[in-house]
């Protein structure tokens, strides 16, 4: 039963790029993306605050669902649409502050145990990864594959879900066929020979999400 402690999100968030710069946020929102995440790693809050402010402003301009990865204090301060946290961040984050600020919350998971932890937090959506091998970041876990992803989707029923990890234009239809609500992509766009064409193809496949 989908009864989060945080504001709800649509079951289908559509194509969900995860990018590390405001420039990419602007490009992709201009290209029609409506769900996006700014993920800048290993910097102090004061080093990323200007980028967070700019990204949130772009999200508002395009009426997009803009999630900030990790920097939850800045997301609250500048009123982002939502925050995305990894498992390792859950214990050190003031979830009640995010909830009180009215921000949505997404949580990463990699196995059944982490799904249990995520469900206990009652977030707005649950991310399931990594589906395929990925070069984007070092992963301690093995790729889950489509069968495991489908099993998690069955378990989570009406909970909004996002698949992530090694998803390419070619693999996207099979990922969506598991019933997952959304697909998050990184290198499929940012490392594409023609990012505009890749984005257009992925939007055709995954859509922009439900209202």
From Swiss-Prot:
<dbReference type="GO" id="GO:0005737">
    <property type="term" value="C:cytoplasm"/>
</dbReference>
<protein>
    <recommendedName>
        <fullName>Thiamine-phosphate synthase</fullName>
        <ecNumber>2.5.1.3</ecNumber>
    </recommendedName>
</protein>
<feature type="binding site">
    <location>
        <position position="137"/>
    </location>
    <ligand>
        <name>4-amino-2-methyl-5-(diphosphooxymethyl)pyrimidine</name>
    </ligand>
</feature>
<feature type="binding site">
    <location>
        <position position="70"/>
    </location>
    <ligand>
        <name>Mg(2+)</name>
    </ligand>
</feature>
<feature type="binding site">
    <location>
        <position position="166"/>
    </location>
    <ligand>
        <name>2-[(2R,5Z)-2-carboxy-4-methylthiazol-5(2H)-ylidene]ethyl phosphate</name>
    </ligand>
</feature>
<feature type="binding site">
    <location>
        <begin position="134"/>
        <end position="136"/>
    </location>
    <ligand>
        <name>2-[(2R,5Z)-2-carboxy-4-methylthiazol-5(2H)-ylidene]ethyl phosphate</name>
    </ligand>
</feature>
<feature type="binding site">
    <location>
        <begin position="186"/>
        <end position="187"/>
    </location>
    <ligand>
        <name>2-[(2R,5Z)-2-carboxy-4-methylthiazol-5(2H)-ylidene]ethyl phosphate</name>
    </ligand>
</feature>
<feature type="binding site">
    <location>
        <position position="108"/>
    </location>
    <ligand>
        <name>4-amino-2-methyl-5-(diphosphooxymethyl)pyrimidine</name>
    </ligand>
</feature>
<dbReference type="InterPro" id="IPR013785">
    <property type="entry name" value="Aldolase_TIM"/>
</dbReference>
<keyword id="KW-0460">Magnesium</keyword>
<feature type="binding site">
    <location>
        <begin position="37"/>
        <end position="41"/>
    </location>
    <ligand>
        <name>4-amino-2-methyl-5-(diphosphooxymethyl)pyrimidine</name>
    </ligand>
</feature>
<dbReference type="GO" id="GO:0004789">
    <property type="term" value="F:thiamine-phosphate diphosphorylase activity"/>
</dbReference>
<feature type="binding site">
    <location>
        <position position="89"/>
    </location>
    <ligand>
        <name>Mg(2+)</name>
    </ligand>
</feature>
<dbReference type="Pfam" id="PF02581">
    <property type="entry name" value="TMP-TENI"/>
</dbReference>
<keyword id="KW-0479">Metal-binding</keyword>
<dbReference type="InterPro" id="IPR034291">
    <property type="entry name" value="TMP_synthase"/>
</dbReference>
<comment type="function">
    <text>Condenses 4-methyl-5-(beta-hydroxyethyl)thiazole monophosphate (THZ-P) and 2-methyl-4-amino-5-hydroxymethyl pyrimidine pyrophosphate (HMP-PP) to form thiamine monophosphate (TMP).</text>
</comment>
<comment type="pathway">
    <text>Cofactor biosynthesis; thiamine diphosphate biosynthesis; thiamine phosphate from 4-amino-2-methyl-5-diphosphomethylpyrimidine and 4-methyl-5-(2-phosphoethyl)-thiazole: step 1/1.</text>
</comment>
<dbReference type="InterPro" id="IPR036206">
    <property type="entry name" value="ThiamineP_synth_sf"/>
</dbReference>
<dbReference type="GO" id="GO:0000287">
    <property type="term" value="F:magnesium ion binding"/>
</dbReference>
<feature type="binding site">
    <location>
        <position position="69"/>
    </location>
    <ligand>
        <name>4-amino-2-methyl-5-(diphosphooxymethyl)pyrimidine</name>
    </ligand>
</feature>
<dbReference type="InterPro" id="IPR022998">
    <property type="entry name" value="ThiamineP_synth_TenI"/>
</dbReference>
<keyword id="KW-0784">Thiamine biosynthesis</keyword>
<comment type="similarity">
    <text>Belongs to the thiamine-phosphate synthase family.</text>
</comment>
<keyword id="KW-0808">Transferase</keyword>
<dbReference type="GO" id="GO:0009228">
    <property type="term" value="P:thiamine biosynthetic process"/>
</dbReference>
<dbReference type="GO" id="GO:0009229">
    <property type="term" value="P:thiamine diphosphate biosynthetic process"/>
</dbReference>
């Amino acid at each position: 039963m989908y009864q989060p402690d945080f504001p709800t999100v649509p079951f289908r968030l559509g194509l969900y790029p995860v990018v590390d710069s405001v420039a990419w946020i602007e490009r992709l929102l201009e290209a029609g993306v409506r769900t996006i995440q700014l993920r800048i790693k290993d910097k102090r809050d004061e080093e990323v605050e200007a980028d967070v402010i700019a990204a949130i402003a772009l999200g508002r301009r395009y009426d997009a669902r803009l999630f900030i990865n990790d920097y939850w204090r800045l997301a609250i301060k500048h009123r982002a649409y939502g925050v995305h946290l990894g498992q390792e961040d859950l214990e050190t984050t003031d979830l009640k502050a995010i909830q009180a600020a009215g921000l949505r919350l997404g949580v990463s998971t990699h196995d059944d145990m982490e799904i249990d932890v995520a469900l206990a937090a009652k977030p707005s959506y649950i991310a399931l990864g990594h589906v395929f091998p990925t070069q984007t970041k070092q992963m301690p876990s093995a790729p889950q594959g489509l069968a495991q992803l489908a099993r998690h989707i069955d378990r989570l029923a009406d909970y909004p879900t996002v698949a992530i990890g090694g998803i390419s234009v070619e693999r996207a239809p099979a990922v969506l066929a598991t019933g997952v609500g959304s697909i998050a992509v990184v290198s499929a766009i940012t490392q594409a020979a023609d990012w505009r064409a890749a984005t257009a193809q992925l939007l055709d496949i995954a859509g922009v999400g439900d209202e």
